[in-house]
Amino acid sequence: LYEFQMALETKDGREELTKRIGLRDFKVEQRKDEQGTGFTFVINGKPIFSKGANWIPADSFTTRLKKQDYQKLLKSAVQANMNTLRVWGGGIYESDDFYDLCDEMGILVWQDFMFACSLYPGDDNFLQSVEREARYQVDRLKDHPSIVLWCGNNEIAWAWHNWGWKDKYPEEIYKEDYNKLFHKVLPAVCQELDPSRYYWPSSPGDGDTLPGKGQGYGSGDNHFWDVWHGGEDFSAFDDNVGRFMSEYGMQSFPDLKTIDLFCDQGQQNLESDIIKSHQKASLGNGNVEKYVDMYFPKPKNFRSFVM
């Protein structure tokens, strides 16, 4: 990183600003081949394998977060040999500390705009509000070398194709509103304020306007949730590999030390109201039990279940 110091002096006083920047070349290489179209990160002319995770808010009460909290989590990502984090569109635009640390640690950031898993209006008032927010965030973050890609939303195009939305909502209205927001307003802001960075309309997707084809393993990026949501064996991960797997996973209980912070040991069981209230997945604890039963001997108690 290079440190730049700037000063502006007038008869009324002096303002100083110090910024750090990094110099690098980045592109998303989308080369056509026999499977479809690739989706490869290329840094300084060298294709890389992107290993990483989706980043969600690190605390339910984000104002409690300090720089050292980000430092601990991001250091853990680096120690796990991760080089890429996707700031998920159902969370928040992160603090300056987060991006500063990613710059320092060499972590690439896929930055979603904060739209996820829902329908959004396309009226002028809403679009103007979105444009103001997008302009603020792009202008705030564009000097961070860690950010390599802007993405319009999380799973909204996918939802159209796979969540039954086609049968619930009028296609013409939905399509028009969607395309105005994610194929006109947001890319226009990026092109004006940050033209060197790549813009991708929706994750997962093929980059097309709606209706498009949805996600496919031959092109674009993919989310795969047949393991966990679909109940498939872990081996399904090996059989469902796309060009860029930007989201997949398996739920895990937190460390016992964390559980002890909010639940007395006498109430630590899968049916207790406290444990249930902390389980936010629609499939609940039963799905965790299912996968534990598939791979491990029956746990003796709750604590052995978590461990």
Predicted regions located by residue number:
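Secreted/periplasmic carbohydrate-active enzymes, especially glycoside hydrolases
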Residues: 1-85, 104, 216, 230, ...
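Alpha-helical scaffolding within the catalytic cores
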Residues: 30-39, 95-97, 132-140
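Aromatic- and acidic-residue-enriched carbohydrate-binding clefts of CAZyme catalytic domains
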Residues: 46-55, 108-121, 137, 149-176, ...
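Hydrophobic faces of well-ordered beta-strands that scaffold small-molecule active sites
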Residues: 51-53, 85-87, 109-111, 152, ...
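The substrate-binding groove and active-site-proximal loops of carbohydrate-active enzymes
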Residues: 54-67, 80-91, 113-129, 156, ...
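Aromatic-lined substrate-binding rim segments of carbohydrate-active enzymes
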Residues: 75-80, 84-130, 136, 212-235
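Active-site neighborhood of glycoside hydrolase catalytic domains
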Residues: 104, 120-213
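Substrate-binding clefts and catalytic carboxylate motifs of secreted carbohydrate-active enzymes
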Residues: 150, 181, 188-191, 197-307
